[in-house]
């Protein structure tokens, strides 16, 4: 029997999972360490120990980020708060396993907690109702059911249990630094033109959804993002060739981060590329085919305008 779609699980199944909050793992790692190597993330996460492979965990990460974006927009909270919740989830699942912690519960609790951390209060009742409606959007009666007293209080307790687990797992460390402030400072200091700034902001929004924020500090991500956006825009930034040194980023580190970013872009490009068309049906023909002239086609990027090969050109540094 195939795997059940996460959005179509029964209400009873979801609630039964969350009632077992006491079965959630206790933090086993050093909570003061919030940055990890790529090897730690890909090979030694708690989920990996429970048999969840990298592809599955990446899918779950994408799922809770998409869910958080939808939930945040439904509640009209800022993008900073939504991004803060995403990072909370990233950190949580470097301490706890997806196998034992439902991502919809953790994501909902993360957004509620992020609203508090970012001084953007949001009523718990609003979070509960909005989350339930998104989770069970396939069920026409969900919007009515969540307003019933018993269902509402049961789901509210689930979210509060998730919040308690998030707090204990993070050792109450809620001061999350995002790349937005250092990016704004860098763009202002370098007098970046509007198109470059827009590209950089869009990149940062994408990086928040990945493990990049678990590998590098915000000012490093911001600096590398400006360099990447400038390269794609063929724009010159800064008055000196190695302007990134002014932001405390070495050339070696910059190259390392940009390589990670290019890998993420390439993975995203392949994921969004449609499957190749089936080969044309061959029909028998006794006619002698005429000579065909060679056709030279220019390489194009129909799905992404990210010329990754530009980083292989000489003299880019």
From Swiss-Prot:
Fetch the CDD domains from UniProt. CYCLIN_AcCycT_rpt1 (cd20587), CYCLIN_AcCycT_rpt2 (cd20588)
| Entry's Gene Ontology BP terms | cell division; regulation of transcription by RNA polymerase II
Record's GO cellular component terms: nucleus
What does the entry state regarding organ or tissue expression? Answer: Abundantly expressed in flowers. Expressed in roots, seedlings, rosettes and stems.
List the SMART domains.
Answer: CYCLIN
Q: Name one GO molecular function term.
A: cyclin-dependent protein serine/threonine kinase regulator activity
- The superkingdom listed in its UniProt entry is Eukaryota
Name the UniProt key words of this record, in alphabetical order.
Answer: Cell cycle, Cell division, Cyclin
- Subunit description: Interacts with CDKC-1 and CDKC-2.
The UniProt family comment states: Belongs to the cyclin family. Cyclin T subfamily.
Supply the name of the protein: Cyclin-T1-3
Which species is this UniProt entry from? Arabidopsis thaliana (Mouse-ear cress)
